[in-house]
Amino acid sequence: MVTSHLLCGAALTVTSDKLVDKKFWSAVEEMEVTHFPGVPYHYETMCRLRLERLPLTGIKTFTQAGGRLPETFKERITGYTKTTGSKFYVMYGQTEASPRMSTLQPEMYELHKESVGQALPGGEFIIEDDQKKVLPVGSKGQIVFHGPNVMLGYGASKEDLAAGDELRGVLRTGDTGFLDEDGFLTVTGRDARMGKIYGWRINLDELEREIEEYLSACVVQLDNNIWIGYLDSLDEESRKELLNAVTQKFSLPVSVFKFVELNAIPTTSRNKTDYNSVLQLIKDQAQK
């Protein structure tokens, strides 16, 4: 982010103030910031602070990467940018790809709300199965990116640095997803976030996304149970409605789902859900 902007002749505003501090927004206003790059945590916080109350009218471009932003927040931000004439770009990337791989153009949002867009010029996505066989359009599998921006390899020693180009422009992302007929990519989760209940493979990220239609939550597996850690109040009627939706979509019995109320969803230093900490909280709760 820093390098690309400096190469384009842009100036950067750097502050140690937090997003919830008045000083942060004073700096945005005083320095006449025109581009705001953020991760999901930033945009969720801005929505909770109420976008209309923040000094954002000078910002022409909002960009979002660093993980999946729930649909409700994307809708709010897109709606806000339409009233101000600014633009909101959803992006997808990894550090190993320097780091951007796709962008969803604002004018395509209404047609592809769950997508992270098409590959950047010069790049290409394919979807592979566990045997590295290319899958057809619409099939879910591992996302593989081909492009000139893919790194040479990981360097932990002088020998690694001397190894040359080990990846040869091909990055197996470890993410799962699918492509449509126009090349728009939808990310459904991480390979590492695949659970198995009674022999049935479950994409925990996909399940979490479905649950987020009802409440703010995170999902982990512990033994043969799916635990839902939630923040919002959850009455019995809402619980039944949620369970009815997810059991039908994922073909799981109601008995595998357990609920636990959390004071906050733990996050990593990069403001992503810390699932290891969530799992520990649930283990502690289960032992009580």
Task: Outline where the language-model segments fall.
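Conserved AMP-binding/adenylation subdomain of ANL enzymes
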Residues: M1-H35, L120
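Gly/Ser/Thr-rich phosphate-binding loop
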Residues: A10, V33-G38, C47-H112, E124
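Active-site glycine-centered loops adjacent to acidic/histidine catalytic or metal-binding residues
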Residues: G66, G93, G117, D175, ...
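Adenylate-forming AMP-binding core of the ANL superfamily, especially NRPS adenylation
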Residues: R68, S102-L104, E110-A156
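Conserved ATP-binding/catalytic segment of the ANL
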Residues: G138, Q142-D205, Q221
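C-terminal boundary motif of the adenylate-forming
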Residues: G174, M194, E210-D232
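Conserved C-terminal "lid"/linker of ANL adenylate-forming enzymes
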Residues: G195, A245-K288
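Short, conserved charged micro-motifs
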Residues: D235-L242
